[in-house]
Amino acid sequence: LEKQGKVALQYGPTEGYGPLREWVAQHKSTSDVTISPNEVLIVSGSQQALDMLGKLFIDQNSKVLVESPSYLGALQSFSMYEPTYVAIDTDEGGLIPAEVSAEKSAGARFIYALPNFQNPTGLTLSAERRQELVERCAAAHIPVIEDDPYGELRYAGEPQPSLLHLGRKAGATVIHLGTFSKVLAPGLRLGYIIAPTAIIDKLVQIKQAADLHSSTVTQMAIYEAIKNNFLETHLPVVRELYKRQCHYMLDAMAEHFPEGVHWTQPEGGMFLWVTLPQNMNAQELLQKAIARHVAFVPGEPFDATGNAKTNTLRLSFVTVSEERIREGIAILGQLIREEI
C-alpha cells in the first residue's frame, strides 16, 4: 500500500491485475503448450467461476454431464440455472471416458470434471483416461470444464497431464479452473479461469455485471507473495503435512474399520471416500456420530441425479490433528461395528 496504494485502492480491469494474469499464464504453460495472459481471467474464487460458467452455458433443461459422484459446490452453482444432469459413472479409476457416449453427449452444453484428487472421492484420472476423455469431447464438440483446485497438492504417485494441455493438442475446448485457496489461504477468495479468448470475452462481461472485478488489493498481495517462487518452498511443506494427515487417517481406518468397509487411497488432495456395507445408511450414521462429536459428509448430496447410494460418505483429513484423527476414526469404527 505504501508503494502502490493508488493502484491497489482504485478500480481495476475486470480481467484482473496484469502481472498476476501473466504469472498464471507462465505457471500453466509447458514446453509444448503456451498459455497467453489474454486467456486468463481472475475471479473471486473458483466458486465464482462455476457460477459464471453456469450463467454462460446453461439454460433451463440444458443437458450437463457430471461425474457421479461430483463436487457439491459445482452442483449447487449449476442447479441455479435448472439444467438436466446426466451422470457419467466412475469406478476405482475415476471417471469412465467410455461413458461419455454419443447418446449421453448429444446436445450437452459441457462436461464438468475434477481429474486430480476428485472431491469427494479423492481419485485421480490416469493419463490414458484423460486422453480418451478429451478426444471423445473433441469429437462430440463438448466443452470440458476442468476444475483443478487440488492439482498442486500431490504427495504420492506421478503427476498427470492436465486436460487443458491434452485438450489443446486434441482440438478440444477445455476451460481450466484454478484457485489460490488451497495453496495459500481460502479466505483470500481468489482464483482464475483459463479458456479460449472467445469464452474469456463473454465471461468478462458476466463478471463485470456481477462485481466489476476481484479485489485489487488481494490480487496484488498474492502476486507479491508468489512472484519470487514462494510456492516452490511453501508447497512442499503443505504437501508433507497433508501426506502425514492422510496416512494417519488411513492407518486408523485399517485398524478400526470392520471388514466390509472400503475406502479410496488418494495420492493427494484433501478427501477420501468410504463405502459402507449395503445395509447401512450414512445419514443415519451421521446422527449417531455427531452425538459423539464426530462429523463427516454423507455421499447422497454429491449425486446430481437422485440415484445416490445411501451407504457412502466423505472424510477430510487436512484440518485436524493426528490425535483427533485417530480418536474420531476409532469412534466412527465403533459406530459402524454397532450398526453391522
Segments (PLM) and residue ranges:
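Conserved core segment of the aminotransferase class I/II
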Residues: R168-E240
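Short hydrophobic/aromatic beta-strand micro-patches
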Residues: I194, W273-T275, S316-V318
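Conserved core of the PLP fold type I
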Residues: E2-H141, I145, G151-K169, Y242, ...
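PLP-dependent enzyme catalytic core of the Aspartate aminotransferase-like
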Residues: A170, A291, N307-I340
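Conserved glycine-rich beta-strand-loop-beta hairpin in the small C-terminal domain of fold type I
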Residues: Y223, E240-L250, H262-T275, L285-K288
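Conserved PLP cofactor-binding pocket of PLP-dependent enzymes
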Residues: P149, L153, I290-R314
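Short, conserved charged micro-motifs
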Residues: M280-L285, E323-E327
